[in-house]
């Protein structure tokens, strides 16, 4: 974000002030719409028109609320699951057939995985037979400049 003070995106005037609001929204994720309610969310609000501006911290809280509401793994759960198996990000990414940077974004909260990937990670972390199968059949190269290896 740009340094404070910001202009209001609605009325284009300077005059955003810190505020605490009971924030309600609906967020679409993976083909579903989730209603979210975040009481006492710290935001910035325009003194002139009342518009709300979300900073990075507010966006992180909204994303965390989405994960809870949708029943998705939290970033730290993904990281702990990987570490409990003694895997590097590269190893887990290869088994899940995703790019290592994608897995890194899931673990840091920068991106929310789709429900199908969330379920695949849960199975991978909990079911040794599924883990072995995915490791044996991993044909996706995490280097996007390399073609997939033969099966």
What are these language model-derived features?
Residues 34-63:
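Short metal-binding segments enriched for Cys and/or His
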Residues 10-38:
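Short recognition patches in nucleic-acid-associated and regulatory proteins
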Residues 115-135:
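DNA major-groove recognition helix of helix-turn-helix/homeodomain DNA-binding modules
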Residues 59-83:
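A short, Lys/Arg-rich alpha-helix, primarily the initiator
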Residues 3-5, 43:
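Residues immediately within or flanking Cys/His clusters that coordinate Zn2+
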Residues 133-151:
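Helix-turn-helix/homeodomain-like alpha-helical modules used for DNA recognition
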Residues 8-11, 46:
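Short cysteine-rich clusters marking metal-coordination/redox-active sites
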Residues 87-104:
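Short alpha-helical DNA-recognition segment
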